[in-house]
Every structure is written in structure tokens, then in C-alpha cells.
């Protein structure tokens, strides 16, 4: 019981609020509250670093241009030199299904701009920014390009993308795999009931469209969870369950007990009484935030109640079907002798 209090006594946000940005699929601010003081900075910094460095994505790793031997060449009839074309290709936002490497083909004839939407990507690759300009062709000029696309994470320099058996004319480029472009966070104060020094975490995430901000945050949280699992060197004690069916009740029969049987402190008992909470079944359906909004009900009272409920196999925020039963007083009297 004492071991569990290390994490069960801490307040946790019940849900995330998502505030969409100008382009909802690319920019959003995710708000989590309330958090224990200091946890906003702890979680915000960790999630930001993971979002920017560790998410898998797709990127072009090399290109070949018909008639071009190296990246310092100029292509006749193309207004941009190869270095500029490479810079434009780096901005391609891709979503790839399955493993790489994959190939994409581009053929175009001038005059006019050549955009990413003209690339033949195949069914395994989606181009998220088809309006991106790759280059500009003069009248009658034909251009042929081939792109190598792969999956990875973070940033990989061009030198690492050159295979040992690279053919003449293959131009490796820097690969920016991360689908997350920018992440910022800030911490604000928030209150729960009478307590005013909790943290509110606001994470603003911008992606390239290959993944939504909400999904990228979920992936980052899962990565963090997986990395921390190794540090847990104990088995969690399981709470004693008291859910033997009796009289075909669809809920734990402890819920029929009255809260004044819990031997709570005078302050806690009075707060429950003033809030018209009579049975444990009434109590467990309250969330932590709802309890803390009760007048004169503080963190100490909350921890006291959570500890008692845990020992009964119960917790705050439960959903109880068919509650309250119509004959609750009769059931409580009939089952009183079993407690």
C-alpha cells in the first residue's frame, strides 16, 4: 500500500484538450492539466526531445538526374542548378507504407514549373506537399529524375546515404526523416478546487502532414514509456478484489456500503456529507478533480479516500452500471451482514 502511494497519490490529467492550428492536420496545441508542480517541465521537455529526434518517417536519400554526373553541375534548360534542386527535394514531405528503399520517377517537359505532384510515387508513397516546386524548365526542355526513398529517424548526412556500389550520377542528399518540424511548450499555473499551484502543460506541435500532431505526441509518449520500463524493478501489488456475485448484482457489493463506515477523518466525512455522498457507489463515480472542487476538501482528504478505496479494489472515476438500484436501501440492509 505504501509503495503504491508513490504514484497513486499524485494528481493526473483526466484527458487531453486539442486546440487545432491554422491547418489542423499539421499544427495543434495539446493541453494537459492538472499536473503536479514541476511535472509540466519534466514531461514537456522529454516529449519535445523525443518528438524532434525519435519518430520514424520517410525521406529522399538520393537522386539521379538524366545527363548529370554530380551535384555541382548545371542542367541545360533548367533555371536552377543541381544544388538548388537538391535543396528543394529536401523539403519533400512523404508518407511511406511499408519498408524501404522505394523508387519514385519524375518526367517533365517545359516550359513551366515542375512540382512534386508530377512525381510518379506509386501506391506505397504519398506526397504530402504536391505543390512544392522542384525546378523550372525552359521551353522544349525534357527532364528525367529518379528518387530513392527510405524510412528512418532523425537526421542522416548525405555521406551516410551513399551506398558502396553507387552508380555514376547518383547524388546522395541529407535525409531529414522526422515528420515533426517544430515543437514548443510552455507551462502555466492552474487550479483544482482550493489548490492553485498545479501545472498546465501546453505543447504546440507542427508536422509535415505525414502524421497528425496528436498522433505524433502519442507515439512520443509510447517511446518514453517503453524506455522507462526497464527502470521499474518491482512487481505492483494487486489490490484485494471483493467482487463475488451476490443476488445477481451487476456491481461490486462494497458499493452498497455507506461512506460513514469507512472510518474517515472528521473533515473528510463532513465534506462527503455536505456533498450528499451517501454510499460508496456514489463516491467512486466522482473524479479526483470533482472531489477537489468540493469546499474544504483538500489533497490530504483525497489521498485518504483513495487509499481506503484501493484496499477495497475500488477507485475514483469508476463507471458503475445500473447505479443506483431502485431498492438500494433494502439491498444495503440485506447485504450488511456480509461485510
Swiss-Prot record:
Q: Which reaction does it catalyse?
A: RNA(n) + a ribonucleoside 5'-triphosphate = RNA(n+1) + diphosphate
Main EC class the enzyme belongs to: transferase
Q: Where is this region: Alpha C-terminal domain (alpha-CTD)?
A: 251-339
Keywords in alphabetical order: DNA-directed RNA polymerase, Nucleotidyltransferase, Transcription, Transferase
Record-linked HAMAP family? RNApol_bact_RpoA (MF_00059)
SUPFAM superfamilies xref list? C-terminal domain of RNA polymerase alpha subunit, Insert subdomain of RNA polymerase alpha subunit, RBP11-like subunits of RNA polymerase
Gene3D superfamilies per the record?
A: 5' to 3' exonuclease, C-terminal subdomain, DNA-directed RNA polymerase, insert domain, RNA polymerase, RBP11-like subunit
Q: Tell me what organism the protein belongs to.
A: Gluconobacter oxydans (strain 621H)
Transferase listed as a keyword? yes
Q: What does this protein do?
A: DNA-dependent RNA polymerase catalyzes the transcription of DNA into RNA using the four ribonucleoside triphosphates as substrates.
CDD domains in the record: RNAP_alpha_NTD
Q: Name one GO molecular function term.
A: DNA binding
Spell out the subunit comment. Homodimer. The RNAP catalytic core consists of 2 alpha, 1 beta, 1 beta' and 1 omega subunit. When a sigma factor is associated with the core the holoenzyme is formed, which can initiate transcription.
Q: Which InterPro entries match?
A: DNA-dir_RNA_pol_insert, DNA-dir_RNA_pol_RpoA/D/Rpb3, DNA-dir_RpoA, RBP11-like, RNAP_asu_C, RNApol_insert_sf
Asked whether the UniProt record includes Transcription among its keywords, one would answer yes
Query: What is this protein's name?
Result: DNA-directed RNA polymerase subunit alpha
Q: Let me see what the UniProt entry remarks about domains.
A: The N-terminal domain is essential for RNAP assembly and basal transcription, whereas the C-terminal domain is involved in interaction with transcriptional regulators and with upstream promoter elements.
Positions of region (Alpha N-terminal domain (alpha-NTD)): 1-235
Amino acid at each position: 500500500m505504501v509503495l503504491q502511494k508513490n504514484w497513486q497519490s499524485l494528481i493526473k490529467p483526466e484527458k487531453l484538450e486539442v486546440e487545432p492550428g491554422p491547418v489542423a492536420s499539421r499544427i495543434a496545441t495539446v493541453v494537459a492539466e492538472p499536473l503536479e508542480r514541476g511535472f509540466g517541465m519534466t514531461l514537456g521537455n522529454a516529449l519535445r526531445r523525443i518528438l524532434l529526434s525519435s519518430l520514424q518517417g520517410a525521406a529522399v536519400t538520393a537522386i539521379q538526374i538524366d545527363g548529370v554526373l554530380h551535384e555541382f553541375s548545371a542542367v541545360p534548360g533548367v533555371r536552377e542548378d543541381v544544388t538548388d534542386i537538391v535543396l528543394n527535394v529536401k523539403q519533400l514531405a512523404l508518407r511511406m507504407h511499408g519498408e524501404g528503399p522505394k523508387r519514385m520517377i519524375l518526367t517533365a517537359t517545359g516550359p513551366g514549373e515542375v512540382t512534386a505532384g508530377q512525381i510518379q510515387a506509386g501506391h506505397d508513397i504519398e506526397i504530402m506537399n504536391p505543390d512544392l516546386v522542384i525546378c523550372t524548365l525552359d521551353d522544349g526542355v525534357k527532364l528525367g529524375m529518379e528518387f530513392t526513398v527510405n524510412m528512418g529517424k532523425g537526421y542522416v548526412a548525405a555521406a551516410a546515404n551513399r551506398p558502396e556500389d553507387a552508380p555514376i550520377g547518383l547524388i546522395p542528399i541529407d535525409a531529414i526523416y522526422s515528420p515533426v518540424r517544430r515543437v514548443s511548450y510552455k507551462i502555466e499555473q492552474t487550479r483544482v478546487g482550493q489548490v492553485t499551484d498545479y501545472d498546465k502543460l501546453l505543447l504546440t506541435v507542427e508536422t509535415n502532414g505525414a502524421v497528425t500532431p496528436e498522433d505524433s505526441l502519442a507515439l512520443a509518449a509510447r517511446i518514453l514509456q517503453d524506455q522507462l520500463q526497464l527502470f521499474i524493478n518491482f512487481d505492483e501489488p494487486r489490490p484485494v478484489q471483493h467482487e463475488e456475485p451476490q443476488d445477481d448484482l451487476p456491481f461490486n457489493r462494497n458499493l452498497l456500503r455507506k461512506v460513514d463506515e469507512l472510518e474517515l477523518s472528521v473533515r473528510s466525512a463532513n465534506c462527503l456529507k455536505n456533498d450528499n455522498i451517501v454510499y460508496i457507489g456514489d463516491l467512486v463515480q466522482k473524479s479526483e478533480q470533482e472531489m477537489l472542487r468540493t469546499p474544504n476538501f483538500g489533497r490530504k482528504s483525497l489521498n485518504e479516500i483513495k487509499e481506503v478505496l484501493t484496499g477495497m479494489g475500488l477507485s475514483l472515476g469508476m463507471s458503475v452500471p445500473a447505479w443506483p438500484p431502485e431498492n438500494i436501501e433494502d439491498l444495503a440492509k440485506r447485504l450488511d451482514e456480509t461485510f
